[in-house]
Amino acid sequence: MDEIKVVPYIPDEDYDNPAMVVDFYEFTMANCLFLHGFKDTTLVFDMFFRKNPDNQGYSISAGQRKLTRFLLNYHFNAQDIWWLRTKGMSEEFCEYLRTYRWKGDMYALPEGTVCYPHVQMVRIECDLVGAILIETYLLQTMNFHSLIATKATRVTGLNTHTPRSVMEFGTRRAQGESAGNDGAYAAVLGGCVGTANCLAEMKFGSDVKAVGTVAHSFIEFFPTEFDAFKAFADTYPDSVSLLLDTYNIMESGLPNLIKLDDYLCLLYTSPSPRD
């Protein structure tokens, strides 16, 4: 048999295919088992965790929505096959992946369900290749979403009788754009009233509503704190959300908020009609 010449792969920073979010050893294992005739063998994998984060009493199972979308759209592109050839995968395996679509079964707790250690969050039943190659993406998606959703229920008090209105503001500290979007979704699932992330609402809809306050720099731009409050309230009278801690909450922020409330009451309260 003639040796197949493999053209060196050219990196592309703009390329993105979630199916390639795979730890490399998944490919080496799948290729080996494929060549030994096990490609049609059905495997069953359960995903569970051994202890709750921070030794708390429960966790929230989340990430099922994104995982389902991933499996429904699972495929490999020509660029993926090209790269796999350069990494030593067999020609037979690469040709198999070229037309491969995920065709297994996924059983999972409903997203947002309370769950506990050693309880299966997700069960996968699939042919050997599909079961092995999705492990990395499955764990990444479920672990991250569940972590954020669980933390959000505690921050918002959703796990108590006195929940609080909390806005998610984590994108600027997230580990990348995808984490910012997924974190916003999971935080709202865990009880947050909205997110500062505009793209999250564009992706997920009004259930993940984009909301916000103002920055300290906005307050400092004006001659006085009250001037800043008034300018914002005049612009957005139906949605006033402000910061009180730019200077001093008790000595400045709160008194100026009360002053603003008096101003808005006079401005927008209609006089009683005369008899």
Across the structure, where does each feature detected by a protein language model lie?
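N-terminal, Lys/Arg-enriched amphipathic/low-complexity engagement segments
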Residues: 44-95
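A short, hydrophobic C-terminal helix/tail in secreted or cell-surface proteins
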Residues: 272-275
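Buried, small/hydrophobic-residue-enriched core segments of structured protein domains
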Residues: 2-42, 51-53, 88-89, 94-106, ...
